[in-house]
Design a protein with these regions (language model features):
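Polytopic transmembrane helical bundles with strong interfacial aromatic enrichment
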Residues: 1-236
Length: 236
């Protein structure tokens, strides 16, 4: 049979039964296509409750914001699990092509949103929406989601270092972009009655925005230097 022939002459490159089962399960559940609308739904609901809470504080709104925050955290855990899953199946870091890079940018955006805005509901809601939008872009039919072999030029430990750092830097930059837009929205919604509370939220978002852009710039700079080292090592 074909399987026996493959095992006889190509056993060194054939995936194990566990990896085959893992890939079948991964393709069957299509986790990233489901994640994008879940991210967006959780973020929109959370954002609505957060905005209402700015104008009217009560226990119900606080509870709902907390529930939405936990939901976003669970979705991020599934996002992380999906990337680890692809890593296990392919045997290499899951940012080796356009599709995987977009998944990784979405993950990095959500990671930095949770890291910098863990006490800011507006930041978490805004970041979750952008992460969902990024995953939606990855689900479009112009990108091939297939798990393929690594291109020879990428078969290097620099894939783990350079690409991981420089692509992850897009995460805090994206976070800064959405926080800037949300800050402008809050400015438009500011009036005499809510000015004090709005100013606090805008100041909070501005501080987080500055931290995100600073981290993004540092990561992008380091990533460029690492890329130069990779090029020197590969081509001289």
């Amino acid at each position: 049979s074909i399987k026996s022939f493959q095992q006889k002459y190509g056993s060194e490159v054939m995936p194990s039964e566990d990896k085959i089962d893992a890939e079948v399960y991964y393709n069957k559940h299509d986790i990233f296509t489901k994640l994008y609308w879940m991210y967006m739904l959780a973020s929109v609901v959370m954002f609505i409750f957060v905005i209402i809470r700015i104008f009217k504080e009560n226990r119900f709104l606080k509870t709902m914001v907390g529930i939405c925050g936990v939901a976003v955290l669970i979705l991020f855990g599934l996002h992380t699990l999906g990337l680890i899953w692809r890593w296990y199946i392919s045997g290499h870091a899951p940012w080796s092509n356009a599709y995987e890079s977009i998944l990784y940018v979405g993950w990095a955006t959500m990671f930095f949103g949770l890291a910098f805005g863990r006490k800011s509901s507006l930041t978490i809601a805004s970041t979750a929406f952008v992460a969902g939008f990024i995953l939606w872009g990855a689900s479009m039919n112009w990108l091939n989601p297939a798990i393929s072999n690594l291109q020879p030029v990428l078969d290097s430990y620099w894939l783990m270092i350079h690409v991981a750092v420089i692509v992850a830097s897009y995460g805090p930059f994206t976070l800064g972009m959405i926080l800037g837009l949300v800050s402008l929205l809050l400015i438009l919604l500011t009036n005499d009655k809510n000015k004090k509370r709005m100013d606090l939220n805008i100041r909070e978002l501005t501080i987080i925005n500055e931290m995100a852009l600073t981290v993004g710039l540092v990561m992008l700079t380091i990533g460029n230097f690492l890329g130069g080292q990779w090029a020197n090592e590969s081509w001289g």
